[in-house]
Amino acid sequence: MITKEEAQKIAKLARLKFEKDIVEKFSTQLSTIMNMINILNEIDCKDIEPLTSVSNMNARMREDTVTSSDLSNKLFDNVSGNSARLAKEVKYFITPKVVE
């Protein structure tokens, strides 16, 4: 059983603030969760194969092909506004000042 003091310490570490009447409920809930975890820890899983996929479907694989291309022209085609021409020339995005 998790005590009220332990529950308050856990809440403080998690940067949570509870009213005094909620701390008891919190400690009860944490105790329940810890009991569930202890039950799971007692299960013998030595002979069970680890699950590698939730579905039995095989992933479709494709060959990786290396291509060399300069996508910057396509990227800067999407720039609009007054700075579009300059952005395409210098190959930088021009944004409004965000830091003083």
From Swiss-Prot:
Entry EC no(s): 6.3.5.-
Cystine connections: none
Keyword annotations: ATP-binding, Ligase, Nucleotide-binding, Protein biosynthesis
InterPro entries linked to this entry: Asp/Glu-ADT_sf_sub_c, GatC
Nucleotide-binding keyword on record: yes
Catalytic activity: L-glutamyl-tRNA(Gln) + L-glutamine + ATP + H2O = L-glutaminyl-tRNA(Gln) + L-glutamate + ADP + phosphate + H(+); L-aspartyl-tRNA(Asn) + L-glutamine + ATP + H2O = L-asparaginyl-tRNA(Asn) + L-glutamate + ADP + phosphate + 2 H(+)
Record's keyword annotation contains ATP-binding: yes
GO biological process: regulation of translational fidelity; translation
GO molecular function: asparaginyl-tRNA synthase (glutamine-hydrolyzing) activity; ATP binding; glutaminyl-tRNA synthase (glutamine-hydrolyzing) activity
Gene3D superfamilies: Glu-tRNAGln amidotransferase C subunit, N-terminal domain (1.10.20.60)
Quaternary state and interactors: Heterotrimer of A, B and C subunits.
Family: Belongs to the GatC family.
Job of this protein: Allows the formation of correctly charged Asn-tRNA(Asn) or Gln-tRNA(Gln) through the transamidation of misacylated Asp-tRNA(Asn) or Glu-tRNA(Gln) in organisms which lack either or both of asparaginyl-tRNA or glutaminyl-tRNA synthetases. The reaction takes place in the presence of glutamine and ATP through an activated phospho-Asp-tRNA(Asn) or phospho-Glu-tRNA(Gln).
HAMAP family: GatC
Name this polypeptide is given: Aspartyl/glutamyl-tRNA(Asn/Gln) amidotransferase subunit C
Natural source organism: Rickettsia typhi (strain ATCC VR-144 / Wilmington)
